[in-house]
Regions:
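Conserved loop-to-beta-strand segment in the C-terminal subdomain of adenylate-forming
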Residues: 26, 112-137, 164-179
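Gly/Ser/Thr-rich phosphate-binding loop
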Residues: 1, 14, 105
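Active-site phosphate/pyrophosphate- and oxyanion-stabilizing loops and adjacent acidic/basic residues
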Residues: 4, 46, 95-96
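C-terminal boundary motif of the adenylate-forming
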Residues: 18, 63, 101-127
């Protein structure tokens, strides 16, 4: 097994990466074929035709790559978006990299049909407070915390470090910090704790619009 991969495909399973859609080099939708793959949707020929092509390949909807025989899944096809310049952005890969920081609780990457991707970031407030306390400072509310320049500088450093792992067109050019926690109860997260993209984009519509309307403060 290789770290970051889901292992090698089963012996009787054929795996192919469809690189026709123009993702990153070597990356594309994962197609599979073999006796263990479903033959179609019950009494739903339209759905079957969408999922299984004329050559019998099942289109998984996952984006990934083969790395020396190991299969690596990088995103879901339905979550990938294009910038106005026609470049594909795989938000999950960027979000996961940013969430590696102890100072980031949640993040969503936005920028569909825009010139560049941006991020809405929910800080891990407990960790950020400890960072302030280590400097002998105490902070009031979460709202106070996200408006402090030191917090923005801290998160910018994390964004810059994350950006080093991605292509020029994938780099987060701007971000905004938000103070309200995302949860299942308040509707931003699924029961599996995945983010509900449409809900979050709608919730922060004004904030996102501000990023792309020339309102360029961090």
């Amino acid at each position: 097994h290789r770290v970051g991969s889901v292992g090698k495909p089963l012996p009787n399973l054929q795996v192919k990466i469809n690189q026709e859609d123009g993702y990153r080099q070597g990356e594309g939708e994962i197609l599979v074929k073999g006796p263990s793959v479903m033959v179609g949707y019950y009494k739903n020929p339209e759905a079957t035709a969408q999922a299984i092509d004329a050559q019998g390949w099942f289109h998984t909807g996952d984006i990934g790559m083969l790395d020396e025989g190991f299969l690596r899944i990088t995103d879901r096809k339905k979550e990938i978006f294009k910038t106005s310049g026609g470049k594909y952005i795989a938000p999950l890969a960027i979000e996961n990299k940013l969430r590696e920081s102890p100072y980031v609780a949640q993040v969503i990457v936005v920028g569909e049909n825009q010139k560049f991707p941006s991020a809405i970031i929910l800080p891990e407030f407990e960790t950020v407070r400890k960072w302030y306390q280590s400097q002998g400072k105490t902070i009031g509310s979460n709202e106070d915390l996200i408006n402090r320049e030191e917090t923005k500088d801290l998160i910018k450093q994390i964004v810059d470090e994350s950006n080093a792992n991605f292509g020029q067109w994938e780099k987060i050019k701007q971000f905004r910090l938000v103070a309200d926690e995302w949860s299942i109860a308040s509707g931003e997260l699924t029961p599996k704790l995945s983010i509900k993209r449409k809900v979050i984009v709608a919730k922060y519509k004004d904030l996102i619009d501000g990023i792309y309307s020339g309102n360029n403060h961090r």
